[in-house]
Structure formats: C-alpha cells, structure tokens
Amino acid sequence: MCRIFIVLLVVAALAIIIEGQLTFSSGWGNGKRSISSEQINDDCNPEEAIFQIYKLIVSEGERIRACQRDGKM
C-alpha cells in the first residue's frame, strides 16, 4: 500500500512538472530583462573591467594590511 502511494505521489509530481514545461511560451519577444540596443555600452572593454577589479583587490589588501599593522584585526 505504501509503495503504491509513493509511486502515485511521484507520478503526480512529474505530471505537474511536465505540465508546467508544456505551457511555457518562449514567443514573448524581448522581456524586461533583455538588453535593448539603447542600453548596450560599447565603451567598456574587458581589460578595463579586469583592471578595475585589480585596483579594488589591491586597495582592500592595503586596508587589511593597515588594520593588521595597527592591531585592529
């Protein structure tokens, strides 16, 4: 009896998942999270982004060293 209940429960869960996948529509066009041509910024390149991240890491490292030197950590 318990095995039949578990099988029916699994089948019901799968039916819900499958029904959700069948009703999904990909034909909605551009949603609110898509990038429009007006929002694209070609001025930013990957090298600049990496350099900004590097500068952030260096500045945080300097702050940590200063705190360790002053005995605050």
Curated annotation (Swiss-Prot):
The record lists the membrane-crossing segments as: none
Q: Name one Pfam family in it.
A: Adipokin_hormo
Q: Which UniProt keywords apply?
A: Amidation, Cleavage on pair of basic residues, Hormone, Neuropeptide, Pyrrolidone carboxylic acid, Secreted, Signal
Where in or outside the cell it occurs: the entry states: Secreted
Q: What positions are modified (Pyrrolidone carboxylic acid)?
A: Q21
Annotated GO CC locations:
extracellular region
Q: Which GO terms describe its molecular function?
A: hormone activity
Disulfide linkage: none
Q: What does this protein do?
A: This hormone, released from cells in the corpora cardiaca, causes release of diglycerides from the fat body and stimulation of muscles to use these diglycerides as an energy source during energy-demanding processes.
Q: Which family does it belong to?
A: Belongs to the AKH/HRTH/RPCH family.
Protein name (Swiss-Prot/TrEMBL) = Adipokinetic prohormone type 2
**Species per Swiss-Prot/TrEMBL record:** Agrotis ipsilon
